[in-house]
């Protein structure tokens, strides 16, 4: 009975730790997009690995298309883009799954260009925790 009571005392702490990790992951994603919007390569670099890469999916003639983009090229394109038109990616909701050092952050978004909705979709971001 003592073991059961002790276990029940720690269950809420386990959930709290998971929520704290989710908050940290959400903060990482928000920091990335803050750097994206401000064309700040240092801010972006503070939350990505040097081996970062981006995959982009789309449809062409009803077929799925996958593009692989080198992270350095992506960041260079973001920070060197002109000030106009203004890009704004609005992050709408976060669904975060964590398993050990691996996390997936699923983020619904709207992409606006000069205050006009361009498109919407989902960012699926895989993150790895380095100990």
Residue spans for each PLM region:
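Hydrophobic pocket/interface hotspot
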Residues: 32, 44, 52, 105, ...
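Short beta-strand edge/turn micro-motifs at domain boundaries
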Residues: 104, 120-131
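Short, solvent-exposed secondary-structure junction/capping segments
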Residues: 30, 34, 48-62
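Surface-exposed, charged secondary-structure patches
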Residues: 58, 66-116
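Short, solvent-exposed loop/turn segments at secondary-structure boundaries
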Residues: 20, 117-118
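Sec-dependent N-terminal signal peptides
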Residues: 3-17
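Short, low-complexity N-terminal intrinsically disordered segments enriched in polar/charged residues
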Residues: 15-46
């Amino acid at each position: 009975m003592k073991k059961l009571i002790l276990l029940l005392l720690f269950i809420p702490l386990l959930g709290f730790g998971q929520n704290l990790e989710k908050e940290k992951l959400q903060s990482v994603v928000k920091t990335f997009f803050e750097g994206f919007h401000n064309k700040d390569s240092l801010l972006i670099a503070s939350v990505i690995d040097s081996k970062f890469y981006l995959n982009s999916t789309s449809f062409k003639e009803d077929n799925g298309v996958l593009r692989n983009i080198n992270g350095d090229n992506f960041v260079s394109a973001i920070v060197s883009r002109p000030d106009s038109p203004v890009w704004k990616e609005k992050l709408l909701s976060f669904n975060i799954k964590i398993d050990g050092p691996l996390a997936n952050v699923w983020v619904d978004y709207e992409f606006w260009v000069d205050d006009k909705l361009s498109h919407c979709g989902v960012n699926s971001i895989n993150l790895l925790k380095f100990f």
